[in-house]
Amino acid sequence: PGNTGYPNQCIFVFDPEFETYCDEMAQKLVANKMDKNIIGYFSDNELPFGPKNLEGYLTLQNPGDPGRVYAESWLKKQGITLQQITDEHREEFAGVVAERYYKVVSEAIRKYDPNHLYLGSRLHGKPKFIRQIVEAAGRYCDVVAINYYGAWTPSEKTMKHWGEWAQKPFIITEFYTKGMDSGLANTTGAGFTVQTQQERGYAYQHFVLGLLESGNCVGWHWFRYQDNDPTAKGADPSNLDSNKGLIDNEYNLYKPLADAMKELNINAYRLADWFDQQSNTNQ
């Protein structure tokens, strides 16, 4: 996962020390309070919000764990037993977990640095498709960060849902494609694989055009600047041998990719205006 791992994939949001922990972490942001070069903060990466949360908390090993106690109390308030849990209950509870997380974290960040944006926790996978989770993010984030894989073309329906659910703009904080002409094996990572660097450039343009057309995307981050280093020790299992970078491991630029990126990027605002005009014309 894109996080360090939690027991049963349960974040410690119901622990009585969670607020204190967040406050202590956020105190470090005072040093950045007046920094004009900072846009905002991500508070975490790919946290395990999702439909497995409810049973996860209910089956924590320690019966006195605050998360388990909270989940048992929540289940009792719903008037249901463990055997009566439905997918609707699972998604509702995932929203409760996300609500608690974003409320506490956002308040801590803004207490010590009210001058920069809170960009969320980089939702990925299943969580980004669950209404209650995205709604919770929208209530407390200025912009909702999404790591978006598994789609050649950004889904119009999904992006529309993000806007309706969060009532906030979104930013794509991870996406990429890998090229087979790089000499790397490309066996790890979530991005699609294409044949050449030129095709990586086409894939970039295609994906970003879809984001611009949505009317609610305020930015995108390519993952990542440099290729994976197959000789690196202790690398994350998703970052072992793949052509993800703008540059290779000898710091050479993948020029066809970079040229395609530049061609689109310098026209991004004009393209966004054009898509807006088309949308208004079709209404």
Predicted stretch roles:
Residues 1, 44-48, 123-125, 149, ...:
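Active-site beta-loop-alpha junctions enriched in small/polar residues
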Residues 36-40, 45, 175, 189-248:
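Substrate-binding cleft of secreted/luminal carbohydrate-active enzymes
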Residues 58-69, 223-283:
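Aromatic-rich peripheral "rim/lid" segments of glycoside hydrolase catalytic domains that contact
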Residues 92-107, 111-189, 205-209:
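Glycoside hydrolase catalytic-domain groove-lining segments
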Residues 51-56, 156, 182-184, 232-234:
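Short, solvent-exposed loop/turn and secondary-structure capping segments
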Residues 2-21, 84-99, 142-152, 186-200, ...:
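The substrate-binding groove and active-site-proximal loops of carbohydrate-active enzymes
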